[in-house]
């Protein structure tokens, strides 16, 4: 008897779950670091409740941090599922957390894309609001400017681009994780069934008892 899950043996399926969980954990940590760097180097200077663009920057950064934490949690649950595969509550936990992770990462990616577009549209004026000089065409390191204005524009776009790539990757692997959890939950609603067989028995030759055995006999003489 050969047990198969989604065309893979149980051992191979556990390995796929383990690798997917590890990738989610790594992506979540890197995305969290990128969001923390963005807040520490840029957004802590431009947080202004009366500025809609700066407020949108901060909301997207908070969303990025939240998404990274959810991704890490989802990756850990996938790794645990690879060890305790028969647990039904754990399967549902992985499935629900993976779906939430995919939606949150996709929302985060759209928010980061909007931040990049608004930065290009406004030429980074919201990033330079803490400085007193007139505009980005007069960039100079002034004593009353809390950061280097010559680098904040490129640094922000670079960190936003990195975070955007990682959010897209997180959503892809979260969908993959949800697909794997969907397979072990044995849900096939489009077939009109709540469960399907994932155990396939290898065919074995069986002798028919009603089939007479033919033995060689000598010639009959009358």
Swiss-Prot record:
Membrane topology term: Multi-pass membrane protein
Record carries keyword Membrane: yes
GO cellular component: membrane
InterPro entries (UniProt xref): Beta-casein-like (IPR020977)
Pfam families: BCLP (PF12304)
Stretches for region Disordered: 198-222
Alphabetical UniProt keywords: Membrane, Transmembrane, Transmembrane helix
Regions that span the bilayer: 22-42, 62-82, 100-120, 155-175
Protein's cellular compartments: Membrane
Domain of life: Eukaryota
Biased composition (Polar residues): 213-222
Similarity comment text for this entry: Belongs to the TMEM54 family.
Protein name per UniProt: Transmembrane protein 54
Protein species of origin: Bos taurus
Gene: TMEM54
């Amino acid at each position: 008897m050969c047990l198969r899950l989604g065309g893979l043996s149980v051992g191979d399926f556990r390995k796929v779950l383990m690798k997917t969980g590890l990738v989610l954990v790594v992506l979540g940590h890197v995305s969290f670091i990128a969001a923390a760097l963005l807040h520490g180097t840029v957004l802590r200077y431009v947080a202004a409740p009366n500025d809609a663009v700066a407020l949108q920057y901060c909301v997207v950064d908070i969303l990025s941090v939240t998404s990274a934490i959810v991704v890490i949690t989802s990756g850990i649950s996938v790794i645990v599922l690879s060890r305790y595969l028969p647990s039904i509550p754990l399967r549902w936990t992985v499935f629900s957390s993976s779906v939430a992770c995919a939606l949150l990462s996709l929302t985060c990616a759209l928010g980061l894309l909007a931040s990049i577009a608004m930065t290009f549209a406004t030429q980074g004026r919201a990033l330079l609001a803490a400085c007193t000089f007139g505009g980005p065409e007069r960039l100079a390191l002034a004593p009353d400017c809390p950061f280097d204005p010559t680098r904040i524009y490129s640094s922000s776009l670079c960190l936003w681009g990195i975070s955007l790539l990682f959010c897209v990757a997180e959503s892809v692997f979260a969908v993959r994780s949800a697909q794997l959890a969907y397979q072990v939950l044995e849900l096939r609603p489009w077939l009109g069934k709540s469960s399907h067989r994932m155990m396939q028995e290898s065919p074995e030759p069986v002798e028919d008892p009603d089939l007479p055995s033919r033995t060689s006999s000598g010639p009959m003489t009358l």
